[in-house]
Design a protein with these regions (language model features):
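DUTPase catalytic domain/fold
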Residues: 1-147
Length: 147
């Protein structure tokens, strides 16, 4: 399934997101920085993509780490999963945190993260005095694995 998403380049050298294969869920986002940026160990750098998106209503853009960058270089989004709402029209910026012990340099046009467009449901939150009982109840943090 495909959906048209309008993209505005905020600088002429910015890269439009690309899919690695025909059926990839995540599209690669690229560094739109004019120069290389080095992310020192234990620090976070905000990497501009040079693009803005018009995500259709009913969809959300979810920003995830690229597995190779996270596993091989230790770079991943600082907020774990970034959320791009459909009414946001500003530049997409990825906060990359270096979890490794080595500096990592991001060159212009390097792939830095991936975006997945997904449908979502908004809730009509309803305050109540009591919640319906379930077998699980209040058990959490691994409680279902103790039976």
């Amino acid at each position: 399934m495909s959906q048209k998403v309008n993209i505005k380049k905020l600088n002429p050298d910015a890269c439009i997101p690309t899919y690695g294969t025909e059926i990839s869920a995540g599209a690669d986002l690229y560094s739109g920085m004019p120069e290389a940026v080095t992310v020192m160990p234990g620090t976070t750098e905000f990497i501009k993509t040079g693009i803005a998106m018009e995500i259709p209503a009913g969809l959300v853009g979810l920003i995830y780490a690229r597995s190779g960058m996270a596993c091989k270089k230790g770079l991943a989004p600082a907020n774990k999963v970034g959320v791009i709402d459909s009414d946001y029209r500003g530049e997409i910026i990825v906060a990359l945190h270096n979890h490794s012990d080595n500096p990592v340099t991001i060159e212009p046009k390097d792939r830095i993260a991936q975006i997945v467009l997904a449908p979502y449901i908004t809730a009509d939150f309803n305050e109540v005095e009591e919640l319906d009982d379930t077998e699980r109840g209040e058990g959490g943090f691994g409680s279902t694995g103790t039976k």
